[in-house]
Amino acid sequence: MIKLVAFDWNGTLLSDTAITLRSENAALKAVGREPITLLQFQKAFDIPITKYWKNLGMTENFFKKHLLTIEDVFHSIYEKNVNAARTRSGAKGVLKFLRQSKITMVIYSNHNIPNIHRQLVRLNIDGLFDRILANKKAGENAHVFARHKEHLLNEFIKQKKYKPHEVISVGDTEEEIQIGKTYGYYTVAITGGYNTTIRLA
């Protein structure tokens, strides 16, 4: 019996892939790189972010040298545009069904709690989740150098004493699918987000 559904946020519940690509291209331009297409983004995007930028052909030294510029430009453009994003098609219906079924729902994300909560309120779905597992404040960037949200989820699961077969991990990237497979959770892959469909197979 499923007791917990853990949703990724960006690209999974929030339809922000186009906004993210626009922000990424602004950051690339700021450090003298060429813009990328949606398909290039979906093929390259990964966590930690250093791996993503390496997939785009950048060296670690280049990334570290320009990290602050990349982060500042990306977040500046993203936050200016994110209020135009809606939930993914069908998301609200699924969330309401799970709530009516008394299944615990959490968001586990590489984003930060204040900005996620602000969007949840704007989208009128803030009362549906039991917890947001993410960076505690804007500006934290643990995901730049390592995967960390799986540890937040695993700690929550241990606290609640859920068993692996009682958990579903839902996401639009390899990260959420790999987390599920590693720890024995069921997985649901959402296409049309940050990764290509073939990467989610």
Predicted feature residues:
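N-terminal helical cap/lid subdomain that shapes the substrate entry/recognition surface
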Residues: 2-93, 97
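Substrate-recognition "cap/lid" segment bordering the active-site pocket of phosphatases
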Residues: 84, 113-168, 174-183, 197-198
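Anion (oxyanion) recognition and catalysis
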Residues: 99, 181, 201
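Short, glycine/polar-rich helix-capping loops at beta-to-alpha or helix-loop-helix junctions
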Residues: 192-201
